[in-house]
C-alpha cells in the first residue's frame, strides 16, 4: 500500500500532523489495553505544552519560548526535510547550491531574532564538493554558521569514506567547525 505524503506545515513537518487513519490501516492487531503506551497522533498533541509554537507558526519567538520552557540556553538548528530535497543523485549542482543558499540565508535571518541563543548548522550542496566547500566558507564566515549537517547516504556515487570528500573535511578543519551526520527527521 502507498502511504499518503507527509503534511508539511510551513516547512515544519511533524509525525503528529499525519492522519491517524493512515496508521490505523497499518495496525494489523489492536494491542491489548494496558500493554502499550498510547500517544496521540492527532487532536491533542504529544507535546501539548508546546502548542503555542503551532499557533505562532513556528516563528523564532516560539523557538525561544520553547527553549525557555525546556531550560535550554542555546540551540543549534539543523535542516529537516530540506536534506531530502538536495539528496537526489544527478541533481544539477547549481540547483542544489541555489536551494542551500536560500535555506541557509533564511535560517540565518531566523537566528537573528536572538543570535546569542539561536545558532545554525549549514545545509551544503553535495553534488559538487567544491560548491560544498564554498558554501561552508560563506555560511561560517558571513552568516556565522557553527558547522554543517549532511545525510550519511552516498550521493552521485561517492560514499563518505571516499577521498572525493577530503576537501570538504579539510575545510571543516580549517574553519574549526564540526560536521554532523544524520539520516533525517524520522531516523
Map each language-model feature to its residues.
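Helix-coil boundary/capping segments in enzymes
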Residues: 1-187
Amino acid at each position: 500500500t502507498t502511504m499518503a505524503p507527509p503534511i508539511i506545515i510551513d516547512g515544519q513537518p511533524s509525525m503528529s500532523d499525519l492522519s491517524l487513519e493512515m496508521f490505523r490501516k497499518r495496525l494489523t492487531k489492536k494491542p491489548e489495553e494496558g500493554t502499550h503506551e498510547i500517544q496521540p497522533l492527532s487532536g491533542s498533541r504529544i507535546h501539548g505544552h508546546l502548542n503555542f509554537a503551532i499557533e505562532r507558526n513556528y516563528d523564532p519567538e516560539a523557538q525561544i519560548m520553547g527553549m525557555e520552557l525546556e531550560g535550554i540556553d542555546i540551540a543549534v538548528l539543523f535542516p529537516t526535510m530540506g536534506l531530502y530535497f538536495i539528496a537526489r543523485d544527478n541533481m544539477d549542482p547549481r540547483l542544489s547550491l541555489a536551494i542551500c543558499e536560500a535555506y541557509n540565508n533564511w535560517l540565518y535571518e531566523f537566528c537573528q531574532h536572538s543570535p546569542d541563543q539561536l545558532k545554525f548548522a549549514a545545509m551544503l550542496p553535495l553534488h559538487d564538493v567544491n560548491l560544498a566547500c564554498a558554501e561552508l566558507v560563506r555560511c561560517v564566515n558571513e552568516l556565522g554558521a557553527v558547522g554543517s549537517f549532511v545525510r550519511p547516504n552516498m550521493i552521485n556515487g561517492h560514499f563518505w569514506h571516499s577521498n572525493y570528500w577530503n576537501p570538504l573535511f579539510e575545510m571543516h578543519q580549517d574553519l574549526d567547525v564540526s560536521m554532523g551526520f544524520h539520516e533525517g527527521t524520522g531516523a
